[in-house]
Amino acid sequence: GIPCGESCVYIPCTVTALAGCKCKSKVCYN
């Protein structure tokens, strides 16, 4: 996928999750 520019190490994807991004390997991917 495409990195969304948001990490999800301590907290889940927030803003990018609204764009359909999901957490993978501590980074939010689309």
Swiss-Prot record:
Signal peptide positions on this chain: none
Protein's name according to its UniProt entry: Cycloviolacin-O18
Keyword Disulfide bond in annotation: yes
GO BP terms: defense response
Swiss-Prot/TrEMBL keywords: Disulfide bond, Knottin, Plant defense
Record carries keyword Disulfide bond: yes
Placement of covalent cross-link Cyclopeptide (Gly-Asn): 1-30
Annotated source species: Viola odorata
